[in-house]
């Protein structure tokens, strides 16, 4: 049944997807497979902006992909048990290969959907 919650979930679903896909592309889960890291350590290792990375990391925590121990600059991030099992490239159970590059291959076409619907040019 369609509800306000379902409508909001559908409208905001891309955020969770993009957060996960970017984490896979950047190798976040594999980096955390080496051990817990602060946001600053992750930024150095992955070449990220500290200003942009902290909300992204906290978003991954709120969605259950990561855990955080502590708060502020001293907070430590680590993979959840499931993320370590399924999203670390070094794991035999890695499923991220199915998703790698998806943002580039698929989302680019979806971004042009409204233009395509208006002018008839293919986007997908």
Predicted regions span which residues?
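Conserved Class I S-adenosyl-L-methionine-dependent methyltransferase catalytic core
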Residues: 4-26, 30-37, 41-45, 51-124
């Amino acid at each position: 049944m369609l509800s306000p919650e379902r409508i909001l979930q559908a409208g905001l679903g891309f955020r969770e997807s993009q957060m996960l896909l970017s984490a896979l592309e950047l190798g976040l889960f594999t980096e955390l497979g080496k051990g817990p890291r602060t946001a600053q350590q992750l930024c150095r290792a992955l070449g990220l902006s500290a200003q942009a990375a902290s909300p992204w990391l906290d978003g991954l925590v709120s969605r259950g992909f990561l855990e955080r121990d502590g708060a502020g600059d001293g907070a430590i991030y680590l993979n959840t048990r499931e993320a370590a099992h399924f999203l670390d490239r070094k794991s035999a159970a890695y499923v991220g290969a199915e998703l790698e590059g998806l943002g580039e291959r698929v989302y680019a076409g979806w971004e042009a959907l409204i233009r395509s619907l208006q002018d008839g040019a293919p986007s997908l």
